[in-house]
């Protein structure tokens, strides 16, 4: 393959994830995006819990029962001359570190906001993670077919709370029962909405020109007049779209629509393929790797168990950073210094697997893993380096785990260590006793762990509350001071799954006091894998 053909393939790639608060419509928008990418024929509206029509992107058994997307799956589809990789992120009230880490593997994010509710808690947290890498953000204001808040007010809230400038690309005409469509500020066109056509791609009627009398006929004179006045205000008060500001994560283009009604999603996709960056350079511990390099490099950001219920396998998800992957390729796993031949890599359409013949920078591939691959592992064609920026996040919830059958302690430890390597949960072993404490970012992780311990390791475990409210990884450059710190705080120290020392605090107040008392000790909220 010539360098110019390779460059063309890489330039076509767009890799993004969707971030939202639960129930803002993320799963629905995922489906509609796949519909436009012709990856599915009709959208199985997510009735979620217990209906036979399951959304394409929700699949492990527990998800099917509960109608939530626990696992981060990957879907690839063509759109507008590009090849789009969509990484689905767990979006339910209970999510996990997987969600955070997935955001480290994308070049762009789509933020979905329920226009009736505005900025919600989970959206804030996820935006903080995108800030670690200044990821570009597109915004989709959803649920325009319902009664919503004043759009200007919601934009103002996004700017204020998320510290990002908003540039409206489309603007709604009415909402709820009187929702008539959206006007495209860049194209000077109005797209008219028809309700009840959400399952398929609809032929949308377009009215060219803001002052076209056809618009008054289509939406009614009063609404048209009100809309034109509103638009004048919007154009006066909002930011012009600036591509550089978008790429640096300082400005977000905003699109309005209804994912359920399948309206406005294509405008957002057009913006994504036009403005979102092709695969970006990434830092390693020795240098920066650029997507156009010939040699293959990639890193593992997530490990998923039991994608195939018939086989107890685990699949490691790897983001290709540079070069071209080919079937049967020999790659160096840098951490273990071993060369492995990858003959059966996978590509995904959420649960439907197909074997990869080739993959390029920006793509995500799955590697079969029998416990030898860990999160953060770097694969190269021989070069010794490690990609950085794939962190562990300090858990926010903690439980003590206890066995129903004390003779199975060995299986429990093995299971917990493997689950922690996958990033399903974090394990802490206090220095002062024999407890096993598990830490998570979302409550659902505890359920996932106990059901997987039972099905995969034949271990029945129960959780008990424990007096821990937060954890920090600790280190210090002054050996003497660190020894003193360890001696005086032994009751609050624990080793995590990778034997890294951490401070487990009963309260935030305790943590703050300890940090003040030991200014030379570094307390970290994230830790590199």
Swiss-Prot record:
GO biological process: regulation of translational termination
Major site of localization recorded for this protein: cytoplasm
One example GO MF annotation: translation release factor activity, codon specific
A Pfam family it matches: EF-G_D2
UniProt domain tr-type G: residue ranges: 11-280
Compartmental location: Cytoplasm
One GO term describing the cellular component: cytosol
Residues involved in GTP binding: 20-27, 88-92, 142-145
Record keywords: Cytoplasm, GTP-binding, Nucleotide-binding, Protein biosynthesis
PROSITE patterns: G_TR_1, G_TR_2
Task performed by this protein: Increases the formation of ribosomal termination complexes and stimulates activities of RF-1 and RF-2. It binds guanine nucleotides and has strong preference for UGA stop codons. It may interact directly with the ribosome. The stimulation of RF-1 and RF-2 is significantly reduced by GTP and GDP, but not by GMP.
Family: Belongs to the TRAFAC class translation factor GTPase superfamily. Classic translation factor GTPase family. PrfC subfamily.
Protein name, as recorded: Peptide chain release factor 3
Organism: Yersinia pseudotuberculosis serotype O:1b (strain IP 31758)
Record lineage: Bacteria, Pseudomonadati, Pseudomonadota, Gammaproteobacteria, Enterobacterales
Gene that specifies this protein: prfC
